[in-house]
Design a protein with these regions (language model features):
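Nucleotide-activated donor-binding/catalytic signature segment of Leloir-type glycosyltransferases, i.e.
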Residues: 239, 246-277
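Conserved donor-binding/catalytic core segment of Leloir-type glycosyltransferases
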Residues: 4, 196-216, 222-225, 236, ...
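Carbohydrate-associated surface elements
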Residues: 153, 174
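N-terminal strand-loop element at the rim of the active site
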Residues: 7-15, 27, 31-84, 96, ...
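A short helix/loop element that forms part of the nucleotide-sugar donor recognition site in Leloir-type
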Residues: 49-54, 181-195, 357-358
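Acidic donor-binding loop of glycosyltransferase active sites
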Residues: 276-297, 312-313
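A charged, aromatic-enriched C-terminal amphipathic alpha-helix characteristic of glycosyltransferases
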Residues: 185, 337, 351-380
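Conserved acidic donor-binding segment of nucleotide-sugar-dependent glycosyltransferases
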Residues: 301, 328-339, 348-353
Length: 383
């Protein structure tokens, strides 16, 4: 089957969603489908081939459509730049789809639905958050062949808006288990990353902020590391954006943490993440005590799955969306926004690691990218 993945943003990209898109497309290729990624031809910082950049072996075409890049046009007001870019991209998409046939259109961008639905080709929409509720968006969801929600809470809200439950499938992000085969030993990984051999290492891998300005729990992690300083716990924080790192470095110093207590690695390629996790004693997914939809409804379990795939003890903030897929037999939970409870959970994971190996193996098998995409495509009425 021919599947065309429509990206709203440049591809490849240094942002986390690009990794997710690459994994989705690679899985569909492994399932025997022919995949093409369509993206706007806008200037970005990543120049590498997508397969090399994301560390995937499967081959899929990438087509970049010429568009007006409002974000790079100095004379376009910032508030209008995205609008004009998407308007230009919508026209380019309609022209492309008129002359290039495909069986299914796949996207995670609701803003592109008018152009995709206009083509009369079957559309699968994957939602990573819900836009503002409008009658137009609900109507577009009803016209899609399948709507994929990352969490049950997202699905429930969408049904409440009037979308038929039979169109919706709940599928969190997946994990590529092959990336975690033949991991280096802890000592080998620490040597490669130049990490202290005599410290217990707590690692966080991921974005420091989300949706532009929302903190993801690094502040709480630094406070917990300050509490654990006397226990010899070394904090390793991997991720960007880089413009946030200096701010957190200042906060670390204010918390009494020096370079011998915490390292900010900055962004690393996805291909290096497994070896980074192998170097750690415990993997941490913190969160602030914010009543924001990202934490209450939309949080993806992708990073938790990767932590579990590494075989390391895992500490996670107890967030409602994550409770739908993991429980206390798999991770050590802590209260969001509570540095003392985070320090407690890290200590517990280091001294009394717990994980049900049977449940872990079953969860990871169920949530592999291949299994995930097979369920999505099989449940789509026209596929």
């Amino acid at each position: 089957m021919r599947i065309t993945y429509i990206s709203q943003a440049r591809f490849p990209t240094e942002k986390a969603h690009g990794h997710q898109i690459a994994q989705v497309c690679a899985a569909m290729v492994r399932l025997g489908h022919t995949v093409t990624v369509i993206a706007p031809d806008v200037r970005g910082t990543v120049r590498k081939d997508p397969r090399a950049y994301y560390g995937v072996r499967e081959s899929f075409d990438v087509v970049r459509l010429p568009v007006f890049d409002g974000l790079r046009s100095w004379w376009v007001p910032g508030s209008l730049a995205f609008f004009f870019t998407m308007r230009s991209y919508a026209r380019a998409l309609r022209s492309y789809l008129r002359v290039n046939s495909t069986d299914v259109l796949y996207t995670r961008s609701p803003v592109l639905l008018p152009s995709l639905l206009h083509s009369k080709i079957s559309v699968i929409l994957e939602l990573h958050t819900l836009p503002r509720r409008t009658s137009v968006f609900v109507r577009h969801c009803r016209q899609c062949q399948r709507v994929v929600c990352l969490t049950a809470l997202m699905r429930d809200e969408l049904i409440g808006w009037g979308v038929d439950s039979s169109k919706i499938i709940i599928e969190g992000d997946g994990v590529d288990l092959r990336r975690f085969e033949n991991l280096p030993s802890s000592s080998e990984a620490r040597t490669a990353w130049r990490l202290p051999a005599d410290r217990r290492i707590a690692v966080y891998v991921g974005s420091l902020i989300t949706r532009g300005t929302i903190e993801k729990g690094v502040r709480e992690l630094l406070a917990a590391l300050a509490l654990l300083k006397e226990r010899g716990v070394f904090g390793w924080i991997i991720g960007g954006p880089r413009d946030q790192i200096d701010r957190y470095r200042v906060l670390a110093v204010q918390s009494g943490l020096g370079d011998e207590d915490v390292r900010f690695e900055g962004p690393v390629s996805n291909t290096r993440v497994p070896s980074a996790l192998a170097a750690a004693d415990v993997c941490v997914y913190p969160a602030p005590a914010l009543q924001h939809s990202f934490f209450l409804r939309d949080t993806s379990p992708l990073k938790i799955f990767e932590y579990l795939a590494s075989g390391r003890p895992t500490v996670s903030a107890d967030l409602p969306p994550l409770r739908g897929v993991i429980d206390s037999s798999l991770v050590h939970f802590c209260q969001p926004g509570d540095a003392q409870d985070l320090a407690r959970a890290i200590t517990e994971a280091l001294e009394h690691p717990k994980v049900s190996q049977e449940k872990r193996a079953a969860l990871l098998a169920h949530t592999s990218w291949d299994a995930r995409m097979k369920r999505i495509l099989l449940l789509s009425p026209s596929v």
